[in-house]
Amino acid sequence: MNPINYLYLSALLFTIGAAGVLLRRNAIVMFMCVELMLNAVNLAFVTFARMHGHLDGQMIAFFTMVVAACEVVIGLAIIMTIFRTRKSASVDDANLLKG
């Protein structure tokens, strides 16, 4: 398969994720869209690494996946805490910065 097709797929996935972040108000859905965007960037990194014959893109994708796994753990813990206290996962309802 042509590597350009993978870049098109990566751009499509990133666009879907960005639209989800901008249009949805549920924190869990927004979180999943951010993860979709990270995976799209990983796909682009691996595709560029494959096109140029280097392993740099694959290493960056691996480290991005490690950081994303940590983000999932911390992000879901925060979202679950907000849901338990506010009984809603909407980002519009969570004004936790008020004193």
Swiss-Prot record:
GO BP terms: ATP synthesis coupled electron transport
Pfam families: Oxidored_q2
EC number in record: 7.1.1.-
Annotated catalysed reactions: a quinone + NADH + 5 H(+)(in) = a quinol + NAD(+) + 4 H(+)(out)
Keywords, ordered alphabetically: Cell membrane, Membrane, NAD, Quinone, Translocase, Transmembrane, Transmembrane helix, Transport
Subcellular location: Cell membrane
Functional summary from the UniProt entry: NDH-1 shuttles electrons from NADH, via FMN and iron-sulfur (Fe-S) centers, to quinones in the respiratory chain. The immediate electron acceptor for the enzyme in this species is believed to be a menaquinone. Couples the redox reaction to proton translocation (for every two electrons transferred, four hydrogen ions are translocated across the cytoplasmic membrane), and thus conserves the redox energy in a proton gradient.
Name of the protein this chain belongs to: NADH-quinone oxidoreductase subunit K
Originating species: Mycolicibacterium paratuberculosis (strain ATCC BAA-968 / K-10)
